[in-house]
Regions:
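Hydrophobic alpha-helical topogenic segments used for membrane insertion/localization
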Residues: 2-26
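A short loop-to-beta-strand scaffold at the N-terminal edge of the catalytic core in hydrolase folds
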Residues: 42-56
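Conserved HGGG/HGGXW glycine-rich cap/lid loop of the alpha/beta-hydrolase fold
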Residues: 55-100
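Conserved catalytic-core motifs of eukaryotic protein kinase domains, centered on the activation segment
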Residues: 74-76, 101-107, 167-169
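Active-site loop/oxyanion-hole signature of alpha/beta-hydrolase fold enzymes
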Residues: 82, 92-132
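Conserved hydrolase catalytic core segment
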Residues: 124-170
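Conserved alpha/beta-hydrolase catalytic His-Asp/Glu region
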Residues: 167, 192-230
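A catalytic-pocket lid/entrance helix-loop region that shapes and gates access to the active site
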Residues: 167-186
């Protein structure tokens, strides 16, 4: 074996070992604060994985659907859950691939979320409900409503993305990125870097919050844990 080839193998092995060690470190530390509680909820067994949800209050059924970002979860609604529960039976859901729900290595599409939302309303809620959706989750909620018109009574969309953005078809670059992310070790390493605390803090400062003084470390930690939970 040539020295250059042997050196390349050694460097490659060291790099893979380093990425594996980093991934293990992230896995062990991400949920150590245990901010995403599971004892206050239930799991709905869907065909592609278990979906975590909570149910609170009594009254008109209300479904709260968080953003489809993997850092998001039903905890987005924690500040208003108690107030909404006074007159409603409030359901929060962690979409597949987010929060406390399973994170299978599958292709995540808007239509998949449509299927999840439709199945959840039919199987768990059991009747037409009001729904509130944020950002990217607005699209599957509207699609679900269009496909099954008796699914929702009232629909509220918070900061929905522009229709022009929803109309975009995944190109080769986005498909390649998805393929890379799904790779073992290397893909997980890239994902962990993209979902690092530093990246998350920048996201809050540049996109989520107009005033940085409103950003709390607990909220950031919850989003970080959601991205790595399970």
């Amino acid at each position: 074996m040539r020295k250059s080839t042997k050196r390349l193998l050694v460097l490659t092995s060291a790099a893979v070992a380093g990425m594996y060690a980093y991934n293990r470190l992230v896995d062990s530390n991400a949920a150590r604060k245990n901010l995403l509680k599971v004892d206050n909820g239930h799991y709905y067994k869907w065909k592609e994985g278990n979906i975590f949800y909570t149910q609170n209050g009594t009254g008109t059924p209300l479904l709260l659907v968080h953003d489809t970002d993997s850092r998001a979860s039903g905890e987005e609604w924690s500040k208003i859950l108690k107030k909404l529960s006074k007159k409603n039976t409030v359901y929060t859901i962690d979409l597949l691939g987010c929060g406390r729900s399973d994170k299978p290595s599958i292709k995540y599409t808007n239509y998949m979320y449509v299927q999840i939302i439709t199945a959840f309303v039919n199987d768990v809620i059991g009747e037409a409900c009001d729904v509130v959706a944020t950002n990217l989750s607005a699209a599957p909620v509207l699609m679900a409503s269009a496909l099954q018109k008796d699914l929702f009574n009232k629909t509220i969309l918070i900061n929905p993305v522009p229709l022009q953005q929803l109309n975009q078809i995944p190109d080769k670059a986005s498909k390649f990125k998805q393929t890379v992310i799904n790779l073992p070790i290397f893909g997980t390493f890239i994902y962990n870097k993209l979902m690092s605390p530093l990246k998350l803090d920048l996201l809050f400062r540049n996109k989520y919050m107009l005033r940085s003084q409103l950003i709390s470390s607990k909220v950031e930690d919850t989003y970080y844990e959601s991205a790595h939970h399970g």
